[in-house]
């Protein structure tokens, strides 16, 4: 059995987790998450400098609590991992420097983990997670991507968002409607009282330079603008803005776009399994629609556990365990952090000469 201490500080959650695996069974011993939502809500979004300072303040306490809850001493941990890319650079540095310092102090191997690979690995904690090739819809505040994962766990991005990620669009539309931050949960809550068919909002596409459209890619900026224009038109009439109806219509369109393009991509690449991960994967409308529409095409759907959809260290630990188990990968203690790094470049984090 391998035990990993994992740290996640890529954005506004300070998280430390102790995870382990025996064969193909992955277990969470502790997964402590300190959210900064209250600190950033008055600004309507994450303030990078504030987030980094809060990580510095919270991480020692979160680390102690994770070890205490797991009933383990740091000397008993086999490996230490942290998110190193992509994310907010100042925030990433807090977790990475802490992890590498602990490795040096306690003579432990270090693994720098790609944040998106962490999200993909959250599915390892679900029952009967897929062992063969599958398509992942990774949909969060910062990313909306379709990633093919092959039998050997090689990763290839097949689709992406060209502007706002789906989660970012939820936040911006939520702010536009006067809802609380973060926008995703706020929109989902109020949409329950609305009519999802009330407004016909656009499903934006990305033009292909060769002609037609990029059928696996996403654009949510136009949808956000359409909601803004709708609210402006209603305000000009002097009528009350039907916020529940707008929220429900927006939520429906986002879910339809994500589901339709995911299923199309899976069919075109002869993949019979779809995995949905990331913060927006917690949205109930998206979860139900994906299962319903995929079943019509004989496509199996695996959903990330609800408590592991948003950023957390357990998913980073799972990615580390998978690297150790199947690829025998470790990172140099000289490895730094990067604000941007594509998922196809994740293997570079384990090179003898670090990429950054």
From Swiss-Prot:
Protein's UniProt name: tRNA N6-adenosine threonylcarbamoyltransferase
Species annotation: Prochlorococcus marinus (strain AS9601)
Superkingdom field: Bacteria
Entry cofactors: Fe(2+)
Taxonomic lineage: Bacteria, Bacillati, Cyanobacteriota, Cyanophyceae, Synechococcales
Task performed by this protein: Required for the formation of a threonylcarbamoyl group on adenosine at position 37 (t(6)A37) in tRNAs that read codons beginning with adenine. Is involved in the transfer of the threonylcarbamoyl moiety of threonylcarbamoyl-AMP (TC-AMP) to the N6 group of A37, together with TsaE and TsaB. TsaD likely plays a direct catalytic role in this reaction.
Localization annotation: Cytoplasm
Major localisation: cytoplasm
Catalyzed reaction equations: L-threonylcarbamoyladenylate + adenosine(37) in tRNA = N(6)-L-threonylcarbamoyladenosine(37) in tRNA + AMP + H(+)
Similarity comment: Belongs to the KAE1 / TsaD family.
Cited InterPro entries: ATPase_NBD (IPR043129), Gcp-like_dom (IPR000905), KAE1/TsaD (IPR017861), TsaD (IPR022450)
GO biological process: tRNA threonylcarbamoyladenosine modification
Cofactor binding note from Swiss-Prot or TrEMBL: Binds 1 Fe(2+) ion per subunit.
Gene Ontology cellular component terms for the protein in this record: cytoplasm
Class of the enzyme per the UniProt entry, highest EC level: transferase
Gene: tsaD
Pfam families, per database record: TsaD (PF00814)
GO terms for MF: iron ion binding; N(6)-L-threonylcarbamoyladenine synthase activity
This enzyme's EC code(s): 2.3.1.234
Sites where the protein binds substrate: 138-142, 171, 184, 283
């Amino acid at each position: 059995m391998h035990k990993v201490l994992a740290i996640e500080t890529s954005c506004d959650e300070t998280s430390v987790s102790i995870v382990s695996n025996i064969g193909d069974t992955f277990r969470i011993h502790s997964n402590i998450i300190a959210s900064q939502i209250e600190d950033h809500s008055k600004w309507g979004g994450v303030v990078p400098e504030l987030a980094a300072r809060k990580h510095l303040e919270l991480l020692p306490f979160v680390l102690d609590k994770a070890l205490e809850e797991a009933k383990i001493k740091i000397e008993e941990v086999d490996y230490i991992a942290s998110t190193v890319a992509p994310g907010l650079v100042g925030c990433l540095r807090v977790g990475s420097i802490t992890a590498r310092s602990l490795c040096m102090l306690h003579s432990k191997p270090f693994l720098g983990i790609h944040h998106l690979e962490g999200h993909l690995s959250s599915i390892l904690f679900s029952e009967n997670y897929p062992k063969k090739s599958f398509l992942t819809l990774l949909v969060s505040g910062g990313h909306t991507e379709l990633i093919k994962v092959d039998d050997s766990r090689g990763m290839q991005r097949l689709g992406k968002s060209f502007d706002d990620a789906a989660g970012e669009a939820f936040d911006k539309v939520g702010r536009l409607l006067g809802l609380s931050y973060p926008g995703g949960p706020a929109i989902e809550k109020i949409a329950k009282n609305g009519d999802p068919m009330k407004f016909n909002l656009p499903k934006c596409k990305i033009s292909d330079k060769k002609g037609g459209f990029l059928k696996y890619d996403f654009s949510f900026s136009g949808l956000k603008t359409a909601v803004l224009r709708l609210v402006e038109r209603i305000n000009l009439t002097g009528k009350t803005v039907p916020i529940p109806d707008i929220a429900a219509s927006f939520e429906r369109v986002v879910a339809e776009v994500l589901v339709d393009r995911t299923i199309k991509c899976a069919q075109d690449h002869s993949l019979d399994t779809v995995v949905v991960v990331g913060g927006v994967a917690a949205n109930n409308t998206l979860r139900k629609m994906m299962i319903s529409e995929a079943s019509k095409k004989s496509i199996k759907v695996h959903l990330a556990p609800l408590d592991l959809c948003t950023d957390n260290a357990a998913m980073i630990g799972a990615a580390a365990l998978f690297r150790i188990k199947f690829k025998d990968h470790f990172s140099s203690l000289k490895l730094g952090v990067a604000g941007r790094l594509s998922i196809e470049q994740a293997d570079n984090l384990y090179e003898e000469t670090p990429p950054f």
